């Protein structure tokens, strides 16, 4: 009869021991220690990723600014085509006046071709 009683007492002791080990293993301070270890191992990599992302963001912002500036410049060129046409007309008019003045200075009318030079 003592053996079943001894087994019961042994089972109670092992159950209490198991419960104590479980409580100790899951105690908040142990959990916080494990969390601290995880953070200590992971933090440098996360900090590097953050720095990389910030650098990429700066590069992207610079590229976006460059593209927007280029688009603005192209739009301004398109908008200024009226002025280019006006300048072109004025240049043609100036060339025509110059030719007329050169022809008048040589005694020829602009419609007559100049005499061939004997060179």
Swiss-Prot record:
Cellular component terms per the entry's GO annotation: BORC complex; cytoplasmic side of lysosomal membrane
Protein keywords: Disease variant, Intellectual disability, Lysosome, Membrane, Neurodegeneration, Phosphoprotein
Residues that bear Phosphoserine: 109
Source domain of life: Eukaryota
Localization in the cell: Lysosome membrane
Chief site of localization: membrane
Segments crossing the lipid bilayer: none
Cross-referenced InterPro entries: BORCS8
Pfam families documented for this protein: BORCS8
Record note on what altering residue 66 to P does: In NDOABA; uncertain significance; decreased function in lysosome localization to peripheral cytoplasm; contrary to the wild type, the mutant does not fully rescue defects in lysosomal distribution in BORCS8-deficient cells; reduced interaction with BORCS5 and BORCS7
Record carries keyword ATP-binding: no
GO biological process, any: regulation of lysosome size
Residues spanning the signal sequence: none
Primary role: As part of the BLOC-one-related complex (BORC), it plays a role in the movement and localization of lysosomes at the cell periphery. Associated with the cytosolic face of lysosomes, BORC recruits ARL8B to the lysosomal membrane and couples lysosomes to microtubule plus-end-directed kinesin motors, driving lysosome movement toward the cell periphery.
Subunit composition and interactions: Component of the BLOC-one-related complex (BORC) which is composed of BLOC1S1, BLOC1S2, BORCS5, BORCS6, BORCS7, BORCS8, KXD1 and SNAPIN.
Protein family according to the UniProt entry: Belongs to the BORCS8 family.
Record's disease association: Neurodegeneration, infantile-onset, with optic atrophy and brain abnormalities: An autosomal recessive, severe early-infantile disorder characterized by global developmental delay, severe to profound intellectual disability, hypotonia, limb spasticity, muscle wasting, dysmorphic facies, optic atrophy, leuko-axonopathy with hypomyelination, and neurodegenerative features with prevalent supratentorial involvement.
Protein name: BLOC-1-related complex subunit 8
Organism: Homo sapiens
Gene name of this polypeptide: BORCS8
């Amino acid at each position: 009869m003592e053996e079943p009683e001894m087994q019961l007492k042994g089972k109670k002791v092992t159950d209490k021991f198991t419960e104590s080990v479980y409580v100790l293993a899951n105690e908040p301070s142990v959990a916080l220690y494990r969390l601290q270890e995880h953070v200590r191992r992971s933090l440098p990599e996360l900090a590097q990723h953050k720095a990389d992302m910030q650098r990429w963001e700066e590069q992207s912002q610079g590229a976006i600014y460059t593209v927007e500036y280029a688009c603005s410049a192209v739009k301004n060129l398109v908008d200024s085509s009226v002025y280019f046409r006006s300048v072109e007309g004025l240049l043609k008019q100036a060339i025509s006046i110059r030719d007329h003045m050169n022809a008048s200075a040589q005694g020829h009318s602009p419609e007559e071709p100049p005499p061939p030079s004997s060179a």
